[in-house]
Curated annotation (Swiss-Prot):
Keyword GTP-binding in record: yes
Biological role: Second step of mRNA capping. Transfer of the GMP moiety of GTP to the 5'-end of RNA via an enzyme-GMP covalent reaction intermediate.
Enzyme class of the recorded protein, top EC level: transferase
SUPFAM superfamilies linked: DNA ligase/mRNA capping enzyme, catalytic domain, Nucleic acid-binding proteins
Gene transcribed to yield this protein: CEG1
Bias (Basic and acidic residues) ranges: 399-420
Catalytic activity, EC: 2.7.7.50
Single annotated GO MF: GTP binding
CDD domains associated with the record: Adenylation_mRNA_capping
Keyword Cytoplasm: no
Protein name according to UniProt: mRNA-capping enzyme subunit alpha
Gene source species: Debaryomyces hansenii (strain ATCC 36239 / CBS 767 / BCRC 21394 / JCM 1990 / NBRC 0083 / IGC 2968) (Yeast)
Cellular component terms (Gene Ontology): mRNA capping enzyme complex
Similarity section: Belongs to the eukaryotic GTase family.
UniProt subunit comment: Heterodimer. The mRNA-capping enzyme is composed of two separate chains alpha and beta, respectively a mRNA guanylyltransferase and an mRNA 5'-triphosphate monophosphatase.
Length: 458
């Protein structure tokens, strides 16, 4: 039976820009990142497969966070010489929205006047918090950065990128909130801003155990490699885990309706046949995207009579809509619909669909993931030990008996404080707690979470 899930999806609290303004900003972003292509630069994950559990997470350092069920956006901040500070949200469709009434200071000290970012590009998710809260709250959760104040940092590894967010975005913004509560608590302040909770991959079990404490919907986990740069477009090291039965595909829906012949008219008359749009379609094709405007028939949607009535009662256009579907357990040859994807103009590309199908067939269950966490942790600590031994050997050969530690090789728990004598940020500052947990974490828990606590009172 079709499941038209009623989900409270966030709405962007701003004004969409016209074509000329959008193109100007697209080119500005491309230039900032050293790209010729002005397309959406955000990284896209691939589906988690069994070899990622048995091989990838055992051999590489990864951080994990919950996968928010919201609206993926990039946040772009500039300081125009004539128009002043501009804050924009960029959707996956590469549309730009101007966000008014919000300020991101560049420094902690604005006593002598406001300071402004120019050329800061952050990756995140706009979520609507409706769980465990008295009233809905719109929040932008930052989880990565592409550029900070005109500096392209995509070549940096994840710990460095998160360090930049902590020192040059979250700390100044948090200080601004503390000093200006009347501004951030005003009705026209567009949304709250937070740094998404992350932890090392072997704590995935802890993240899963606290999913029900989140204030927003979440439908899985995201594993981000700590040893690789930020990748534009599909990133084969960025992993999206969902339980096998919750893996979904976005298709384009095409309905084939019955045609009837009017017995009172000549069959040769073109007006003698009509399409019955009121009755349930004979067939609903699910079409897969092959790029550009090219789609091909791929599979079929299961639809009961009561499901059709439910769709009709929506009184919305149905033909050609992008729909999120999952395989029907009772009939693997068909799929069932979960919801419309109004935020997407195309379905998943066929190459992505192939990977999702493989992930469904060879999926990793939540129990298997939890069971593997101690092994992942042991492998992580073994890598740290082997790297430290290698560092000692190399320093011994040069006659140094007390080598300086390589900060990039240390576990996250050893990099939670930034050495301010370094020329640029590295590691993570602030507390290891986060607003996303409905209850405060106990002392000693999640000691290696690379995140930052804002000053919200929730």
């Amino acid at each position: 039976m079709i499941q038209l899930e009623e989900r409270d999806m966030p709405e962007i609290p701003g004004t969409i820009l016209d074509r000329n303004e959008t193109q100007e900003l697209r080119l500005m972003v491309a230039d900032l990142l050293g790209r010729r292509n002005p397309s959406f630069p955000g990284a896209q994950p691939i589906s988690f497969e069994r070899y990622h559990l048995n091989d990838t997470l055992m051999n590489k350092d990864y951080y994990v966070c919950e996968k928010s069920d919201g609206l993926r956006c990039l946040l772009f901040i500039i300081n125009h010489p004539e128009r002043g500070e501009g804050v924009f949200l960029i959707t996956r469709e590469n549309d730009y929205y101007y966000i008014p009434n919000i300020h991101f200071p560049l420094t902690n000290n604005e006593e002598k006047g406001k300071t402004y970012h120019h050329g800061t590009l952050l990756d995140g998710e706009l979520v609507l918090e409706t769980k465990n809260v008295p009233e809905p709250v719109l929040r932008f959760c930052i989880f990565d950065a592409l550029a900070i104040n005109g500096k392209d940092i995509t070549k940096r590894h994840l710990p460095k990128r998160l360090g930049y967010i902590t020192e040059q975005v979250m700390k100044p913004f948090d200080n601004f909130k503390r000093k200006n509560p009347e501004i951030v608590n005003a009705p026209d302040f567009p949304f709250k801003v937070s740094f998404k909770l992350m932890t090392s991959s072997y704590h995935a079990d802890d993240v899963l155990s606290k999913m029900d404490q989140l204030f927003h919907e979440s439908d899985g986990l995201i594993f981000t490699c700590a040893e690789t740069p930020y990748v534009f477009g599909t990133d084969s090291t960025l992993l999206k885990w969902k339980p096998a039965h919750e893996n979904t595909v976005d298709y384009k829906m095409e309905m084939i309706f019955k045609k009837f012949q009017d017995p009172d008219l000549d069959p040769r008359d073109p007006d003698s046949t009509y399409t019955d749009y009121d009755s349930k379609p004979e067939l609903i094709k699910l079409r897969v995207w092959k790029g550009g405007a090219d789609y091909e028939d791929f599979t079929k949607l299961s639809l009961e009579n009561e499901d059709w009535e439910k769709l009709k009662n929506l009184r919305q256009p149905l033909q050609g809509r992008i729909v999120e579907c999952r395989k029907k357990l009772s009939d693997p040859g068909f799929w069932e619909m979960l919801r419309f994807r109004n935020d997407k103009s195309n379905g998943n590309h066929i190459s992505v669909v192939d990977k999702i199908l493989h992930s469904i067939q060879d999926g990793v269950s939540e129990e298997e993931l939890i069971e593997a966490c101690p092994k992942i942790g042991k492998a992580w600590k073994k890598r740290i030990y082997e790297k430290s031994q290698g560092s000692r050997s190399s320093y011994s050969e040069t006659g140094r008996s007390h080598p300086e530690p390589n900060r990039e090789d240390e576990p996250a728990s050893k990099r939670t404080k930034i050495d301010m004598e370094e020329p640029e940020p590295n590691g993570f500052g602030g507390s290891t707690t986060n607003h996303q947990n409905a209850s405060k974490q106990n002392s000693g828990e999640f000691q290696d979470i690379p995140t930052y606590e804002d000053s919200d009172d929730e």
